[in-house]
Amino acid sequence: MSFVECPYHSPAERLVAEADEGGPSAITGMGLCFRCLLFSFSGRSGVEGGRVDLNVFGSLGLQPWIGSSRCWGGPCSSALRCGWFSSWPPPSKSAIPIGGGSRGAGRVSRWPPPHWLEAWRVSPLPLSPLSPATFGRGFIAVAVIPGLWARGRGCSSDRLPRPAGPARRQFQAASLLTRGWGRAWPWKQILKELDECYERFSRETDGAQKRRMLHCVQRALIRSQELGDEKIQIVSQMVELVENRTRQVDSHVELFEAQQELGDTAGNSGKAGADRPKGEAAAQADKPNSKRSRRQRNNENRENASSNHDHDDGASGTPKEKKAKTSKKKKRSKAKAEREASPADLPIDPNEPTYCLCNQVSYGEMIGCDNDECPIEWFHFSCVGLNHKPKGKWYCPKCRGENEKTMDKALEKSKKERAYNR
């Protein structure tokens, strides 16, 4: 492995980008980052070869390109930006595009005919396999997987199914923050601004202009941090959706088990009634006027039941008893909530860290203080009087100012002073 810096990216972009997006990159024998290396420069002698991960630029879902100057199903005019391509001889470095189109992730593989099945197994694609005769000996093929690619973690059949409903919308929102959809990528705009500010900063000799450029860089970094915070908020909403769905499933399981128990009880009682000796019914049938006496008893039982029901309704309609029932229900629900909130029954590891004002381990739902320097950081919902996660920022009782959404002015001032002195 050789660790290099890609020559096709500006210094500012190399500083900010990740390892596979323009920064110092580990590749096998070539001086390009994974994002720019669209070809594994392998000839018939197999000098380079091997398999490397990369990000390929091109429209999503392009069709194969074979021996033509244009894509079959995409808008680009260069074979370098197609989903599949083969080429001989390899293009020069200057022909490799940097950016443009939509991004997919894929895997480059040598494809000699004797081993094409192995290459297909290692680099699985959601496309129909092509015959190895389509490609010449020693050529390569690039596979573009649109969307999310778990690099080195199994084939496309192992991927999770698409989520439905609100969870799908949250996934799409997180994806839009990263790569956009029908618009410029937010992080690309930030990188462009950083690049321009860096170039102007390096050319400037005036101290005031240099400070202005530094402020521009600071604003761009703040924007990137806001994008990261927004993604974290989306992920927390997704976690909340999953937890709500889990609670719904648990409640449905409890109802299903209760219905099963009721059904089993009713079946046992019916079986016991069927096993009664039939002699009693035969003896009653042999008695004279048994039918008439049974009808009279049924009428009397119905009248008694209706009178008792009316009496119960009148008694239960008094406001005092209604109030007593309501208070009993509230007490029961409060005791149940306290039992659920208490972690006394949970096995506690002595080495586990403690949180919150109660200085106990983490359990149930917790919320984090938005003060980065908060000594406690995480709090139980029940300890800070929360029933659900509040919108926007939230500060703990030790860090808040006038309300829970504002930070204490003294703490905020000291925080700014420490940031300024760094």
UniProtKB/Swiss-Prot annotation:
Main localization (coarse): nucleus
KW Zinc (keyword) present: yes
Amino-acid positions noted as binding Zn(2+) 2 in the UniProt annotation, renumbered to this chain: 369, 374, 396, 399
One GO cellular component term: Sin3-type complex
Compositionally skewed regions (Basic and acidic residues) per UniProt: 297-314
Localization per record: Nucleus
Compositional bias of kind Basic residues: 322-334
Superkingdom of origin organism: Eukaryota
MF (Gene Ontology): histone H3K4me3 reader activity; methylated histone binding; zinc ion binding
Protein name: Inhibitor of growth protein 1
Species the sequence originates in: Homo sapiens
